[in-house]
Regions:
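N-terminal, post-signal peptide beta-strand-biased segments of exported outer-membrane/organellar beta-barrel
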Residues: 1-63
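Outer-membrane beta-barrel porins/channels
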Residues: 5-8, 45-46, 54-238
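Small-residue-centered hinge/linker elements
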Residues: 226-431, 435-440, 444, 460, ...
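Amphipathic alpha-helical substructures
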Residues: 433-453, 458, 677-706
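Substrate-recognition/specificity elements adjacent to catalytic centers across diverse enzyme folds
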Residues: 570
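Short, positively biased Gly/Pro-containing turn/loop motifs at secondary-structure boundaries
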Residues: 720-730
Length: 798
């Protein structure tokens, strides 16, 4: 069987120690670590540079490797091919492969063989490779070992050595090689390799980003020139000072925010078209654009944008950071409301479609009360409210706001208005009084009126963006796709897997199975606590609360995780009631200025049949043993799976429920006080169900800092004590469920079936129905207590 060195002479260094390593031809584990590439290699004989003695083509994608090699020895020709499969993590991989030969194979010692291999990179300083070759037609066996050392912990300087032991060979006669590689600048390195035979190879590699060239000259043991091996690579981006220098300041990035901005993808979400970019992906792209020397401008299409105000503020803040690094921003609108214009106003150039308009009415908190509807349906309501501001049941028991609820909503609306108008007037050439007059007197502005008022800079359509970018940036630029930008930003060839900041999402109502899914989520968080690869956790919460059981499960998991490593909570649009409970044990709570937070309180209520059966023709019967066994039985609504009890609670039963709710509140207060390291008396003072904006939350000690998800990640990085290049961010649960069946149910049934999904989004492109969420939770949990925000307290997406 031809030896390892005979079959891998295209390699400039051992396969697991240097770059793409022939993509599985030398060690089948390499493709799992190398990425996606296509390599063409050929060798020359002697000084005839135009001659081609041997050639090969190698490729890898998704851990799969394949290649074809043609070799010539005088009149003999042999063609070899290989297939390999590998998998692993950033610091270890295993692989298996098959090599077959045709032509004059046996004459040149080529026999079909099975190959197995592994690569371990336990640290940035060390790489170890081991491969075994087993001939399938003879008894030949071979073991290849290699080691690579990077004294500086990165690719600037690499030392390497390898050896191949064939079965029956004496260890003292094992062939070996050793050498070194020095990366002069990113993408340019010099390499030398010495063999036990005293032959030497000297090589140079030059990368141009997505392509590169490599050439090595071979000297025989006497020092005479023996030929040359050349390679050309195309594929994943490799760090390259040449590419960055050539493209510096000559590219722009385009972002389309049309439609919803979800936190997570749904499974098969892009089956019938492109899935919208996720919130974190948008934040990442804007950050990477700001950090890239290539990118000089950012174009953002906000037409048909559907995003909640808090998430828009976070995106706006990210854009501001990119601008601070010198990126020019152009924002485009076809039509816009308060939220979309708030986001657009930060841009250096705001363009509005010539036939478009702006609708700027200000902000209002409204609620539709359904007590009259329930009365007409024959559904009776018993509301149990023991805390002044805990108003979640008012929608079902009143026809207007209570004084306390009106007060807290007024304060929140004022904060939202002041933040938005303050940001707009700071970014645009108009004063606060002028903007107030536009909002109070104009409401709807045509495109030309918006331009005259100074709200937009120009009238143009999205297809004219290149001209807008050129005018704004002062030069023509090429479009750098978001995927390409991400590859460039993450193209780090260090060995080993960096420590992780894990971003985990807690979205939707606090429910054990639906919504946030506390059972599964708690398990995930506890696993992160035990995972040594995770250095810190960022818990993104967007939840109006719900079941106290579910909230407590997640809160205890966060507490356990925080005992092992830093945990930072990032509160999104809403983290109230049970959504606040799950946040309490984090080391730091970061909220946006308009996050709905707080609402520390417990509510309960009872909805029962008071003529509903007579009106609908439904009836029920019950056989019971136990004085109150009938309490939880009644009319079960078809399709929805919820029951309507047939009677209201007695005074004795109401007394028992009040005791349970008060005890539940005591436990809630105690949990928050312990998590926030404060007194229960203070939490009772700021509790009683009152909601706060993030800004007000900092004043009463419920929030530590104003910021978004990027700020939470930054704090998590800082808490680890590790350098930025020693950490990577990983989203733990970026995919949600598949289908929301509530969309197929008509009218009131759809309202009942609809659940609050990702941070208030039932499914991409639609709004969850808060009344349906609350009503369903009440019916499923009554007469038990709930830690739930009042429906409608969460601002809707525009």
């Amino acid at each position: 069987m031809a030896s390892y060195y005979e079959t891998t002479d295209f390699l400039g260094a051992p396969p697991a120690s240097f770059r793409e390593g022939l993509l599985g031809y030398g060690n089948p584990a390499v493709p799992a670590l190398a990425g996606n590439h296509l390599v063409a290699a050929w060798s020359t004989d002697g000084r005839d540079a135009a001659s081609v003695q041997d050639w090969g083509v190698f490729t890898s994608a998704g851990g799969l490797g394949a290649g074809v090699v043609r070799r010539t020895a005088g009149p003999l020709r042999v063609t070899g091919y290989h297939l390999s499969l590998s998998g692993g993590t950033g610091d270890a991989a295993v692989g298996v492969g098959y090599q077959g030969f045709s032509g004059d194979a046996t004459a040149l010692g080529r026999y079909n063989r099975l190959t197995v291999g592994t690569v371990a990179r336990p640290s940035p300083y060390l790489s170890i490779g081991l491969a075994g070759n087993v001939a399938l037609e003879t008894d030949d066996r071979e073991v290849v070992g290699e080691v690579g050392v990077r004294p500086l912990g990165d690719g600037r300087w690499t030392l390497f050595a390898d050896a191949a032991w064939g079965e029956g060979e004496a260890l003292t006669g094992v062939p070996w090689s050793a050498g070194t590689s020095v990366e002069v600048v990113d993408g340019v390195d010099l390499r030398t390799r010495v063999f036990d035979s005293e032959a030497v190879s000297i090589g140079i590699r030059v990368e141009f980003g997505r392509a590169g060239i490599d050439s090595q000259s071979r000297l025989d043991p006497t020092g005479d020139y023996a030929g040359q091996v050349n390679r050309v690579r195309a594929g994943d981006y490799e760090p390259s000072v040449l590419a960055e220098t050539v493209r510096e300041g000559k590219e722009h990035v385009e972002l389309s925010l049309r439609g919803p901005v979800p936190y997570r993808d749904t499974r098969f979400g892009d089956l019938f078209g492109d899935a919208p970019p996720r919130f974190y992906e948008l934040l990442r792209t804007v950050r990477q654009a700001g950090e890239s020397d290539r990118v000089t401008a950012l174009a953002v299409d906000l037409s048909d944008l559907e995003v909640r105000p808090e998430l828009a503020w976070e995106l706006r803040t990210a854009v501001q950071r990119a601008q601070a690094r010198g990126v020019t921003v152009v924002a485009h609108l076809e039509n816009g409301g308060m939220t979309a214009y708030h986001l657009a106003s930060v841009a250096d150039v705001v363009a509005l479609d010539p036939q478009g308009s702006l609708t700027l009415p200000g902000y209002a908190a409204s609620r539709t009360f359904v007590k009259g509807t329930l009365d007409k349906l024959g559904l009776g309501v018993q509301a149990w409210r023991f805390f002044e501001y805990k108003s979640a049941f008012e929608r079902f028991s009143r026809t207007d706001y209570s004084r306390a609820d009106s007060l807290q909503r007024r304060q929140y609306v004022d904060d939202q208005y002041e933040l938005t108008t303050g940001d707009i007037t700071a970014a645009r050439p108009l004063g606060a009084d002028s903007l107030d007059r536009i909002i109070d007197e104009r409401l709807l502005l045509t495109a030309r009126e918006a331009r005259q008022a100074g709200l937009v800079d120009t009238l143009a359509r999205w297809h004219e963006r290149e001209g807008l970018l050129e005018a704004a940036a002062g030069a023509e630029t090429a479009d750098l796709g978001t995927d390409a930008l991400d590859q460039i930003a993450t193209a780090i060839r260090d060995w080993g897997a960096p420590a992780e900041v894990a971003v985990v999402y807690g979205l939707g109502a606090t429910q054990v199975e639906g919504g946030m899914g506390s059972r599964k989520l708690s398990k995930t968080i506890r696993h992160l606590a035990e995972d040594d690869d995770v250095a810190a956790v960022v818990f993104r919460v967007d939840s109006p609360g719900g079941s106290p059981v579910a909230a407590a499960q997640v809160a205890e998991a966060i507490k356990a995780c925080a005992a092992e490593k830093p945990v930072i909570v990032s509160q999104g649009q809403v983290a109230g009631s049970g959504g606040y409970w799950v946040s309490t044990h984090a080391d730091t709570i970061v909220a946006g200025p308009n996050t709905v937070t707080g609402s520390i309180g417990v509510i309960g209520g009872w909805i029962y049949d008071e003529g509903f059966g007579d009106k609908t023709g439904l009836s029920s019967d019950v056989v019971q043993r136990g004085e109150r066994a009938d309490l939880l039985r009644g009319l079960r609504l078809p399709l929805l799976g919820v029951s309507i009890p047939t009677r209201k609670l007695t005074d004795e039963e109401l007394g028992r429920v009040e005791t349970i709710i008060q005890k539940g509140y005591d436990e809630f207060v105690a949990a928050v006080a312990a998590g926030r390291d404060t007194t229960e008396a203070h939490i009772r003072d700021v509790g009683a169900g009152r909601i706060y904006s993030g800004l007000d939350g900092t004043e009463v000690g419920l929030v530590d800092e104003i910021g978004g998800l990027p700020r939470a990640i930054q704090l998590a990085r800082r808490a680890t004590g590790l350098a930025a290049d020693e950490l990577t961010v990983r989203e733990v649960n970026p995919t949600s469920g598949t289908v929301d069946f509530g969309q197929f149910l008509p009218g009131p049934l759809g309202v009942l079936a609809d659940g609050l999904g990702e941070g208030g989004e039932a499914r991409p492109g639609t709004q969850a129905h808060p009344t349906g969420t609350a009503l369903r939770l009440i019916l499923e949990h009554q007469p038990g207590p709930l830690v739930l925000l009042p429906p409608g307290a969460v601002p809707t997406a525009e």
